[in-house]
């Protein structure tokens, strides 16, 4: 039996757990060495290899309107053969674009921070490649530019920076991912639904049960035992989420979209690149 104050503390712990899970969804298993080339020109394909030079960890560029291109080759090792691999650049920049074997492949946005990283921070690299197969990986990052404000006395304090640390190759921890998204939804149910609603009661009971099952100290826990507990806790959440409305309930649908704030945020050349990233 939990009283209200104790339940609120428990809910805060579960929100903190959600944040910890977010940072563990992708597990680094390898790295790829990169070389670098910088330009202010609008380049619409991967530059020639001869333009690139060494790129040291910790290097920074502080310049408005700058594009940093990073280039590297990655050979699938035996230990990762046949697996689905992701690329996680530890590169600070306004926006970035991924090219694989000279083809546009994904984007990165660190301009808006969600938890520790941007909205798009870890992209799919390949599925099921055999050991020994090689990929050419290129990353184009943009430092951004000054955008005129709508207020007469507005001044820009933006720092136009690109900072390179390293580039990780990752695998997805499916158990952690499933647990994270289910916990995120049930946490929202407990926060948003009225206390008089039965559905909120179901969500609260599930969260309290998760609190009893899970080990919060992920780093010190035995990995195998922790994942077993996570699966057990996730099963409790999935039971709540499997309870759907009846056929006569209202319907809610989701529609995704992308839009371009052209004309006033970017010049035409950067808008073309922006469309490609999107």
Q: Each PLM stretch: what is its role?
A:
Residues 1-278:
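Carbohydrate-active enzymes and regulators
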């Amino acid at each position: 039996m939990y009283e209200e104050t104790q339940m609120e503390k428990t809910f805060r712990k579960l929100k903190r757990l959600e944040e910890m899970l977010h940072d563990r969804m992708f597990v680094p298993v390898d790295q790829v060495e990169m070389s670098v080339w910088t330009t202010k020109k609008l380049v619409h394909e991967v530059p020639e290899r001869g333009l690139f030079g060494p790129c040291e960890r910790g290097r920074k560029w502080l310049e408005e309107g700058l594009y940093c291109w990073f280039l590297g080759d990655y050979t699938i090792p035996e230990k990762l053969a046949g697996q689905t691999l992701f690329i996680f650049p530890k590169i600070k920049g306004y926006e970035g674009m991924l090219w694989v074997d000279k083809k546009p492949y994904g984007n990165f946005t660190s301009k808006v921070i969600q938890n520790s990283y941007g909205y798009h921070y870890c992209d799919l690299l390949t599925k099921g490649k055999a050991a020994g197969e090689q990929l050419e990986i290129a990353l184009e990052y943009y430092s951004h530019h000054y955008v005129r404000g709508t207020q007469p006395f507005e001044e820009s304090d933006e720092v136009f920076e690109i900072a390179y640390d390293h580039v990780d190759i990752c695998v997805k921890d499916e158990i952690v991912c499933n647990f994270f998204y289910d916990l995120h939804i049930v946490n929202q149910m407990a926060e948003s639904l009225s206390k008089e609603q039965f559905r909120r009661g179901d969500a609260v009971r599930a969260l309290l049960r998760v609190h009893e099952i899970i080990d919060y100290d992920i780093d010190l826990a035995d990995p195998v035992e922790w994942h077993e507990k996570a699966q057990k806790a996730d099963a409790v959440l999935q039971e709540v989420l499997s309870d759907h409305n009846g056929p006569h309930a209202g319907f809610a649908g989701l529609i995704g979209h992308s839009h371009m704030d052209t004309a006033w945020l970017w010049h035409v050349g950067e808008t073309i690149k922006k469309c490609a990233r999107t």
